[in-house]
Amino acid sequence: ALAAVLGLGPKVHPGGSSMGGHISLSWAAAHPEEVASLWLLDSGGIWSGPTSELAATIQRTGVNMLVASNEEEFHRLFQFAMSKPPPMTDGMLDVLAQDRIRNHDLELRIFAQVRGDHLEDRIRGLRVPALIVWGREDRAIHVGTADVLHALLPDSRVVVLDGIGHLPMIEAPGRVVADYLALRDGLH
């Protein structure tokens, strides 16, 4: 009933990237009657996929390349997350860096919490139309995880984008939006 309480209508179209995908999947598992479709971009929460570079690095060194406590770590994160980072001014990068640095401790706590969430058990067989988008060059969550997620969601379709990393909506926004609009158009 959350969608109705928020005035969003009887059914919504949640979507998200990485951790946002994990959150969208969690909501869909808890409230499938409220979900018209899912849009999942390099979604987190699927732990049985192939080991990613990020997972191997965390296991080997304890360093999570997706969090930043200073500007140097943010620039490393920015390069790690994307295969084709868009051009940005120094001012834009500074704003993004300060936001991530400010949230460093919170992000570490959230990563620890979601790591213990066994989402796969809750979404197996979920009958919701879903578009699964993945960057083939994703170093944070292995592209093979898209196939695992697809097997869990029988009404899903997978789009893998060559030359794209963990953030396809930033690296290839035109293609990502076109695929999403096609999903929505196909629901009517």
Predicted regions mapped to residue ranges:
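Conserved alpha/beta-hydrolase "acid-adjacent" motif
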Residues: 139-145
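Catalytic active-site module of serine/aspartate enzymes centered on a nucleophile-bearing elbow/loop
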Residues: 155-188
